[in-house]
From Swiss-Prot:
ANK repeats lie at residues 5-34, 38-67, 71-100, 104-134, 138-172, 176-201. It holds the Pfam family Ank_2. Coiled coil: none annotated. This is Putative ankyrin repeat protein YahD. InterPro entries: Ankyrin_rpt (IPR002110), Ankyrin_rpt-contain_sf (IPR036770). Keywords: ANK repeat, Repeat. The gene is yahD. Signal peptide: none annotated. SMART domains: ANK.
Amino acid sequence: MSIKNLPADYLLAAQQGDIDKVKTCLALGVDINTCDRQGKTAITLASLYQQYACVQALIDAGADINKQDHTCLNPFLISCLNDDLTLLRIILPAKPDLNCVTRFGGVGLTPACEKGHLSIVKELLAHTEINVNQTNHVGWTPLLEAIVLNDGGIKQQAIVQLLLEHGASPHLTDKYGKTPLELARERGFEEIAQLLIAAGA
């Protein structure tokens, strides 16, 4: 292992989950938060490749868990986007910045609601104070995304119910002024419509 190639060796070791090599690189003085050409740090690569023990080792060594790559990814957002509950449970005790947003301007809860990642939504709402009414670049809240960008099925109904129970507003409209109730009814999602009505929509 040459000093010249130390950053590349370190990043590859993290991606492959080679904790001993990661620790050797750190002992040789590599910057723990060095990035590849896409802006991905070692802990981001370990997160993407589900190298959970390596993620924990890097947290313990003081890695920056909030640093985002060129497409705004970081370990917390990766866990939310990829439905990776194991990763989320490693990251949350390290106190990630819950206000970090995806390239579309949504907090981690937003894509989890859109994609139907029920276990992630439950974990976030039970164990964090993440903003349930945060509005992304296209004017949608997590509630609106849960309605508009999925199939209205059982999982989405459960997500809508959880959001409403945790303070999501049934009155916040999209950028065209349409309410969650209107959008649910337009799509024929009557079960979701009834949940919204019960919440005061």
